Amino acid sequence: MRSTTPINTTPINQLGYEACRDELIEVVRLLEQGGLNLDMSLKLWERGEQLAKRCEEHLDGARQRVADVLSARQVEEA
């Protein structure tokens, strides 16, 4: 049973969407692979939850930007 797996310590709020997504994929892979002790599994799971939330924030921001541009375009065309 492995007790140490490197966990990225970069603050999540400093990661872009792609970096969050890629790290989240790696966290899921490690958890699905198994062989980690409980403490490491919990740390990875917590990091994964934070990464998933940050990915959603990035996607929400992108959706809002698209909506703003489309709304501005409609106003210009009116």
Swiss-Prot record:
InterPro entries per UniProt: Exonuc_VII_S, Exonuc_VII_ssu_sf
Gene3D superfamilies per record: Exonuclease VII, small subunit
Chemical reaction(s) catalysed: Exonucleolytic cleavage in either 5'- to 3'- or 3'- to 5'-direction to yield nucleoside 5'-phosphates
Domain of life: Bacteria
Pfam families: Exonuc_VII_S (PF02609)
Molecular-function annotations in GO: exodeoxyribonuclease VII activity
Broad class of where this protein is predominantly found: cytoplasm
Main enzyme class: hydrolase
Keywords: Cytoplasm, Exonuclease, Hydrolase, Nuclease
Subcellular location: Cytoplasm
SUPFAM superfamilies associated with the record: XseB-like (SSF116842)
Enzyme Commission code: 3.1.11.6
Family membership noted in the UniProt record: Belongs to the XseB family.
Entries under PANTHER family matching the protein: EXODEOXYRIBONUCLEASE 7 SMALL SUBUNIT
Function field: Bidirectionally degrades single-stranded DNA into large acid-insoluble oligonucleotides, which are then degraded further into small acid-soluble oligonucleotides.
Subunit field text: Heterooligomer composed of large and small subunits.
Entry protein name: Exodeoxyribonuclease 7 small subunit
Lineage: Bacteria, Bacillati, Actinomycetota, Actinomycetes, Mycobacteriales
